């Protein structure tokens, strides 16, 4: 979708809408891919219990797929994650284990590992290190972008949560368009990708507080740090100027887009 607010600048600023996925986000793609990959490998069986740390949207996707396929799912989340996301997961039948806010995603990951150890027939998708995460975006997200932009784009700008999205899409697009500039977006308060220290921040969905295993930094041309104020500002502008309700991480990406445009 081309954003109207940039048209007068002779710059085509396009946003890929993922809200039409069944669970309302891009994470539905990796939830299905990771579960079906494990099924094909015989790792996931009908009596398996899915346990996964999540900041929200992957949990929604896993709960949705688990409901359809008949799996029990336990999601481990920092207590700071939105109540709205938790309610949606509960509707799909998910169970919860909440971890202290100050421990961030690392705390949720550690707790999930503990639960896997003590729970019979437990399986964890491991979204931060599962190659099926990257594969899902190579096979679907990247191909859809190529269909819409057969002649390529100049910039790919997106936030980094698990690293699967930016890695999967960038690996495909850069092979076709070597001059593509790939920009990773992270919270100013927790600039781990830039070499900074992890810290709590309100931009849910990005900035896990560590560098994910599947994140390929060699594909990244630049990293932009976005403040919480700018993330909220552009999230609000997306609603008031484009009539699109996006998340705070989307606002962070749009703030990074604005920074890039200022340099052109």
Language-model-detected regions and their locations in the chain:
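Short, small-residue-biased leader/transition segments that mark boundaries at the very start
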Residues: 4-11
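Short glycine/serine/threonine-rich phosphate/pyrophosphate-binding segments
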Residues: 29, 53-69, 82-86, 159-170, ...
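Alpha-helix C-terminal capping segments
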Residues: 36-43, 59-72, 90-91, 170-177, ...
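Short helix-loop-beta connector
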Residues: 39-49, 150-155
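Active-site-proximal loop->helix
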Residues: 49-53, 58-117, 193-211
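Active-site/ligand-binding loops adjacent to catalytic centers
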Residues: 109, 113, 119-121, 175-248
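Active-site/ligand-binding-proximal alpha/beta "capping" segment
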Residues: 119-161, 217, 229-244
């Amino acid at each position: 979708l081309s954003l109207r607010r940039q048209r007068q600048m002779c710059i085509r600023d396009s946003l890929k809408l993922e809200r039409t996925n069944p669970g309302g986000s891009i994470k539905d793609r990796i939830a299905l891919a990771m579960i079906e990959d494990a099924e094909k490998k015989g790792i996931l069986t009908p009596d398996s219990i899915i346990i996964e740390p999540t900041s929200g949207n992957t949990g929604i996707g896993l709960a949705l797929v688990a409901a359809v396929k008949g799996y029990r799912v336990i999601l481990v989340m920092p207590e700071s994650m939105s109540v709205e996301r938790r309610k949606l997961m509960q509707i799909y039948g998910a169970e919860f284990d909440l971890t202290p806010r100050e421990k961030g995603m690392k705390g949720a990951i550690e707790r999930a590992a503990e639960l896997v150890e003590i729970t019979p027939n437990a399986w964890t998708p491991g979204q931060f290190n599962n190659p099926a995460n990257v594969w899902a975006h190579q096979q679907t997200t990247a191909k859809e972008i190529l269909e819409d932009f057969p002649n390529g784009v100049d910039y790919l700008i997106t936030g980094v949560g698990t690293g699967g999205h930016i890695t999967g899409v960038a690996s495909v697009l850069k092979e076709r368009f070597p001059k593509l500039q790939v920009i990773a977006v992270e919270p100013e308060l927790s600039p781990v990708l830039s070499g900074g220290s992890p810290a709590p921040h309100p931009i849910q969905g990005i900035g896990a507080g560590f560098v994910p295993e599947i994140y390929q930094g060699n594909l990244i041309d630049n990293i932009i740090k976005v403040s919480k104020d700018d993330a909220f500002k552009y999230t609000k502008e997306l609603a008031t100027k484009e009539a699109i309700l996006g998340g705070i991480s989307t606002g962070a990406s749009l703030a990074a887009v604005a920074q890039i445009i200022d340099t052109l």
